């Protein structure tokens, strides 16, 4: 599935309270439009597939900038 066709998924805010970036152990932000969890500190975007966050650095997309 491409980013353009990623389904809009609602993420439980409680999930964001307990999930952290596996690289930095820092907080994550949810990008609903792209269906990703964002680690600003690591500059990585972790995909959400079929409602499941894929928290593997090798599966993450590098953020530009």
Curated annotation (Swiss-Prot):
- Reading the lineage from the top rank, the first entry is Bacteria
Q: Which InterPro entries match?
A: Trm112-like (IPR005651)
Gene Ontology CC: one annotated term = cytosol
Q: Which cysteines are joined by disulfide bonds?
A: none
Family as reported in the entry's similarity comment: Belongs to the UPF0434 family.
Q: What is this protein called?
A: UPF0434 protein CCNA_00107
Name the species this protein comes from. Answer: Caulobacter vibrioides (strain NA1000 / CB15N) (Caulobacter crescentus)
Organism lineage reads as: Bacteria, Pseudomonadati, Pseudomonadota, Alphaproteobacteria, Caulobacterales
């Amino acid at each position: 599935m491409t980013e353009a066709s990623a389904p809009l998924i609602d993420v439980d805010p409680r999930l964001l309270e307990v999930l952290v970036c596996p690289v930095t152990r820092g907080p994550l932000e949810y990008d609903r439009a792209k269906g990703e969890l964002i680690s600003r500190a690591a500059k990585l975007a972790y995909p959400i597939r079929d409602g499941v966050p894929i928290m593997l650095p090798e599966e993450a997309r590098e953020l530009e900038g």
